[in-house]
Amino acid sequence: RVVQQLEGAGHTVDRLHLDAEGFDPVMRGADLAGYARGQSADPAVAHYQARIDAAQQLVFIFPIWWEVMPALLKGFIDKVFTNGWAYKPSKHGVEGRLTHIERAVVVTMMNTPKWAYRWLYGNAVQRALVRGTLRKCGVRKVQWVALSPVRHATDAKRQAWLQQVGAMFGA
């Protein structure tokens, strides 16, 4: 539905559906051997990097499992956000290279109440993805929308969430 809303608002959408595309999230020995140099043995990495290079905005939509993103998305970030492409080492840590991305939006769904996720479980998505990856890689504007709790959400609540996310893109 979010893709339909974005397209309806005039945005061009390049949807990455990692599972449907058969993305392999596993960092194998050959990948690890070239990791520090920003090299990957997986030919799909350059393909995904080119798609991100063409983007102005990134939207991540995923459920939170065991307080973090699913392994498929984590593996995507590990393999695709490489040294020299997404960031480069600097004397102060890293210098982000994805500065062409105007904005990233992270939309998550979980059953844990938002207050518990933040105060009891340490807000892992904020630390790992928003600050620890996207901002570190040069994306200055990152918005996170946590839809919660989903287990008992009514249809009306779910529709309100879709409208909330759509409104972020002028839909």
Which residue stretches match the model-derived regions?
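N-terminal beta1-alpha1-beta2 submodule of the flavodoxin-like/Rossmannoid cofactor-binding fold
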Residues: R1-W85, H152-A171
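Short, glycine-/small-residue-rich phosphate/pyrophosphate-handling segment
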Residues: K88-R135
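Short hydrophobic alpha-helical module
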Residues: K79-N83, V107, K136
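Short, well-ordered alpha-helix to beta-strand connector turns
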Residues: A55-Q56, I101, V139
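Short, structured loop/turn "capping" segments at alpha-beta junctions
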Residues: N83-K88, V139-Q143
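Residue-level signal for short, function-critical loop segments
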Residues: I64, M110-T112, S148
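Hydrophobic/aromatic beta-strand patches that form the interior of the parallel beta-sheet core
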Residues: D14-L16, V59, V105-V107, Q143-V145
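Glycine-rich phosphate/pyrophosphate-binding loop and the adjoining helix
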Residues: W119-A171
